[in-house]
Amino acid sequence: MKKIEVRDLDLFYGEVQALKKINLDVEPNSVLALIGPSGCGKSTFIRTLNRMNDLIEGVKISGTVLLDGKDIYKEVDVIELRKKVGMVFQKPNPFPMTVYDNVAYGPRIHGIRDKRTLNEIVEKSLKAAALWDEVKDRLHHSALSLSGGQQQRLCIARTLAVEPEVILMDEPTSALDPISTMKIEELIEELKKKYTIIIVTHNMQQAGRVSDYTAFFLNGELVEWGPTDQVFYNPKDKRTEDYITGRFG
């Protein structure tokens, strides 16, 4: 079974159509990269997968989004959905609290209070985000004292702490230096063993490095999607080729 199936998805902001008849499948334990010029619908699309667009006034959505075969707009509670489908944003956004409390925040909201259980979740999540060794002696320091790259990995650990199945990443390295970017890319490769990952990126080389599948968006349309090697080296649509070779962007 596909992890996510999207069928005939349309989205309007008021009268403006931002997504047009999107049809796309996401394989389990894979990395799907979404590429395309600014304003093409990539970020709007991933926000339909955890219903973040519900928070915007005047949004109208039609079509179907299935997670494990269930319609997320009809059959799934939105709080449960956002536990299953985590999100990492473009700019690191740690909460103004300790490193420990950042990671424990989600589990506490979901009712976990036992100190030993929380300790285990915090350690496991920080290890999974490749951050434990750097912060294990600073767990009770402010998260805002970490570097930008560490803060982004902390946000990933915070996402992992509620045990999602899918991780959405909206340009997670665009605000980071090259070394921090490399660490996040290595982390993505490791995380896909356990999670399904969808990443929005403006960086074509990054899409080529980290993804198994690539989807090219343009003006709210999904022009083409498929295995990354095919989309990059043997695209079916001239617009895909023009974008990838830098003729526009």
Swiss-Prot record:
Highest taxon of the source?
Bacteria
| Single Gene Ontology MF annotation | ATP hydrolysis activity
Query: What name does the UniProt record give this protein?
Result: Phosphate import ATP-binding protein PstB 2
Q: Where in the cell is it found?
A: Cell membrane
Q: Hey, which family's this protein in? A: Belongs to the ABC transporter superfamily. Phosphate importer (TC 3.A.1.7) family.
Q: How does it sit in the membrane?
A: Peripheral membrane protein
Q: Please give the NCBIfam families that the UniProt record associates with this protein.
A: 3a0107s01c2 (TIGR00972)
Q: Which UniProt keywords apply?
A: ATP-binding, Cell membrane, Membrane, Nucleotide-binding, Phosphate transport, Translocase, Transport
Provide the Gene Ontology terms for cellular component.
Answer: plasma membrane
Looking at the record, the residues that make up the ABC transporter domain are: 4-244
What the protein does comes down to: Part of the ABC transporter complex PstSACB involved in phosphate import. Responsible for energy coupling to the transport system.
CDD domains (alphabetical): ABC_PstB_phosphate_transporter (cd03260)
Q: Classify the main location.
A: membrane
Q: Does the keyword Lipid biosynthesis apply?
A: no
Q: Oligomeric state and partners?
A: The complex is composed of two ATP-binding proteins (PstB), two transmembrane proteins (PstC and PstA) and a solute-binding protein (PstS).
* GO BP terms, alphabetized: phosphate ion transmembrane transport
Q: Which EC main class describes this enzyme?
A: translocase
**Could you tell me what reaction this enzyme catalyses?**
phosphate(out) + ATP + H2O = ADP + 2 phosphate(in) + H(+)
Q: Which Pfam families match?
A: ABC_tran
PROSITE patterns associated with the record: ABC_TRANSPORTER_1 (PS00211), ABC_TRANSPORTER_2 (PS50893), PSTB (PS51238)
Annotated PANTHER family: ABC TRANSPORTER I FAMILY MEMBER 17
Q: Give the Enzyme Commission number.
A: 7.3.2.1
Listed binding positions for ATP are G36, P37, S38, G39, C40, G41, K42, S43
